[in-house]
UniProtKB/Swiss-Prot annotation:
The species this protein was found in: Methanocaldococcus jannaschii (strain ATCC 43067 / DSM 2661 / JAL-1 / JCM 10045 / NBRC 100440) (Methanococcus jannaschii)
Matches recorded under PANTHER family: DNA-BINDING PROTEIN (PTHR40734:SF1), TRNA-SPECIFIC ADENOSINE DEAMINASE-RELATED (PTHR40734)
Origin: domain of life: Archaea
Protein name: Uncharacterized protein MJ0038
Amino acid sequence: MVRGQYKKGNDERMRFPKKNKPQKFENYAWVLDYLPYGYPDKPDEPIVQGLGEYQFLLMEMIPKPNVDIELGERVYIGKGKRDKIDHVRRMIKYEQLTPTAKSELLYVVMEAVKIQEDRFVRFFNECPPITTRLHTLELLPEIKKKYMWKIIEEREAKKFESFKDFEERIGKNPVRIIAKRIEKELSDDKKDKYYLFVKWKKGIILNEDNMTFYLKE
């Protein structure tokens, strides 16, 4: 891509196909907070606040009796035998997270990103322009125009092979960049119309399968 090429034209409001893409089932979640006696203002059975590993769903889970739960722990919530989680009780919003869960969120997201390295390296290699004047990369923290063009030029010369390769060639920590974007998408309720990784909100969503955008209403 030549610098400035994707900016040609004056149509900033491209039309996105409307689509309600089925959500993928979460197999793993990460523990954000563990409340052995329920919420302080409403004592109840033990509650775990967690984050889905792939779709980054915020959820409330009920642990099995007499199990040890640690902050930042990865727990299985898929089909079949579960070691620590009895069931997922409900989905929750960012505002419903405890102060502890909010403080743990970025660090937990970073761990989830690290073990999905292939997914996010592919994102850096293939993410497209959104409109004639805006590229997906510009939505990432710390990137902006300067690093956007550096990433585009580097990936055209040779695809990124790993997080380490990206950091050595770009000079930025890719795990933190992705994690901060996910944290922003989770916390900015109705303030952000583009969602790259949090698929369950309404807005313009990136379909990572084919790297195109669709409108979810």
